[in-house]
Amino acid sequence: MIKLDMTILDSLKENKALRKLLFSGHFGLEKENIRVTSDGKLALTPHPAIFGPKEDNPYIKTDFSESQIEMITPVTDSIDDVYNWLENLHNIVSLRSKNELLWPSSNPPILPAEKDIPIAEYKTPDSPDRKYREHLAQGYGKKIQLLSGIHYNFSFPEALIDGLYDEISLPNESKRDFKNRLYLKVAKYFMKNRWLLIYLTGASPVYLADFTKTKQEEKLRDGSSALHDGISLRNSNAGYKNKESLYVDYNSFDAYISSISNYIEAGKIESMREFYNPIRLKNAHTDQTVESLAKHGVEYLEIRSIDLNPLEPNGISKEALHFIHLFLIKGLLSEDRELCENNQQLADENENNIALNGLSKPAIKNCDNEEMALADAGLLELDKMNDFIQSLRPEDTYFQAIIEKQKERLLHPEKTIAAQVKEQSATAGFIEFHLNQAKTYMEETEALAYKLIGAEDMELSTQIIWKDAIARGIKVDVLDRAENFLRFQKGDHVEYVKQASKTSKDNYVSVLMMENKVVTKLVLAENNIRVPFGDSFSDQALALEAFSLFKDKQIVVKPKSTNYGWGISIFKNKFTTEDYQEALNIAFSYDSSVIIEEFIPGDEFRFLVINDKVEAVLKRVPANVTGDGIHTVRELVEEKNMDPLRGTDHLKPLEKIRTGPEETLMLSMQKLSWDSIPKANETIYLRENSNVSTGGDSIDYTAEMDDYFKEIAIRATQVLDAKICGVDIIVPRETIDRDKHAIIELNFNPAMHMHCFPYQGEQKKIGDKILDFLFE
């Protein structure tokens, strides 16, 4: 077995900066899932149109089949970030694949006849990507192409390579040659020891009987087949391999390039893309030819042998990602040993033996053809990992715990992923087990559909439009996280967006007018659009003196320039001087000027207008609780606020009901307190204004709303030259009174999340509508 390279280890021990860099890197993932129907059959629908042409979307493509979706993360600087990206892509694809599920196994679901398996479609029939897939279908068959998995792309930090180059490079060795040699060394280690990775991550021991046959299989009660003691059909000789073994020369980078070129010239493979090695040396240039690799050198490694783990929602655990990273670090820190053709054959035998018989703990052969017990061989490698962790990062208990878990799996095969998958498939059936997993994961995705993992600290509307941009393959940069300021880029087209709806389409003066409610009302009224009459005050004493003008009227007291319904008090019934003064105190706490205006009876609706079209209408019900005759108002609020969809600061679709001065005032107007116990089924309103932002409930009314009011909303936005605008209209309950409506506010930064995830009714794709407006 391969020893640790003490030259590198000693250099790292003496250099704290290099030690830190060793455990970092650049990470990217590619994941394939087959789209299936609710009964586990290959979905024959086209690739979802929302993702756009496959050539143009860097994140969401297809692999071989039109039904085989591929998710590609960008390169990140941490495993946490790449895992979040994978989870977000998985969620986006799941939610956009209507009435379909993502099949969680590497082994295919129920397939149609070979001729009916659709090859991925591209912009033109003669696309190189289409031609390549037709070549594969002819050479290997379509069914075998549907084996799916995860590709793990990794590179060491350039600063680490630079530091090691200064410390341990050979005389007269260029930086490029050193880097190529380093990655080649890691690849050799991987090829020799990949059996261990397959044992620990393999997850495809069960498959449908009509997919393939193996000598080691047993029949399960549902008629599916399982490898008797196997780990991974996909990584076995029955999986997806080149037609014949291709042994490349690992003695030098130039020899590696030459041997692949020779296979291409001999017609063994069409191009480097068809070199189905478990690990490939790659660079970031998109043509991915052997000539490009020779010219630019190695920039990263691509590991291709990772099965989809059906026990994980995203197909792989964060723990597995960390272990693979440690595995590659082990390759860097190991002695550079020859990987001749004979050694490659032994490595292939070990891989196939583990893939087909791993649960029976077969012996592992070393390069001298000597056998070692599986557990002993595996523990030897894991102990060396522990050694360099203890030596270079002794404080890291997380990595040590990961190694200990892998040891448990080595000593107890029943704890492997493969054993668990086989057991559960045997109990429920191959199709039923994987369908249940897929449905469970879909339910979990739907429950958090509003969320962008890793951006939970940002406004919900920002998360939504960011997710919708990813779906379209639009590049997103965060310019100012606290301000929710993003940059979207599609090709050469760049858009800057703040808080999801402040865009380049905004007119600055329009924003200023909408920000000032007095100006808004004045301009609308001058254009014969009905608004409530009233007055504004900058002096609280003068506002208080005006009590006699308003005391017998239904009125609204609100700040002049606030948003989200904050600081608003509504009096529909008789009110006292004290009530009036408290309302002024609240309003002046939000602004230096307040408006006192008539209360318009009716229901409040939010009309979302984008580019002169009403895209959504929402009825907003004021914050309320329903009594049960047992609990107090305060207790009922606490219970309603436990809804997982309720949060604060617009981070969830609904806002928690507050227990502040506005709510206390509203209760007092009903002769109630927080300790009052409402009757069963009695609705108690805690707010007069119906903003969702203050704990109200949202109900979609887009289809039901009269076009008469939609036209009024559009006209109001046209008057102020507003392109993305929330128009709040009080609509009378009786049709005969519709002329008694009034616009009470125009919002230049309307929240979209309440339309996307209403309390009741149809969810609207507002992020898509804004992106359409910006980019099309």
From Swiss-Prot:
Record bears the keyword Transmembrane: no
Catalytic activity line of the entry: L-cysteine + L-glutamate + ATP = gamma-L-glutamyl-L-cysteine + ADP + phosphate + H(+); gamma-L-glutamyl-L-cysteine + glycine + ATP = glutathione + ADP + phosphate + H(+)
Protein name in UniProt: Glutathione biosynthesis bifunctional protein GshAB
Chain's role: Synthesizes glutathione from L-glutamate and L-cysteine via gamma-L-glutamyl-L-cysteine.
Residues holding Mn(2+) 1: D728, E745
Region (Glutamate--cysteine ligase): 1-354
UniProt source species: Listeria welshimeri serovar 6b (strain ATCC 35897 / DSM 20650 / CCUG 15529 / CIP 8149 / NCTC 11857 / SLCC 5334 / V8)
Residues the entry annotates as binding Mn(2+) 2: E745, N747
Sequence ranges assigned to domain ATP-grasp in this UniProt record: 521-775
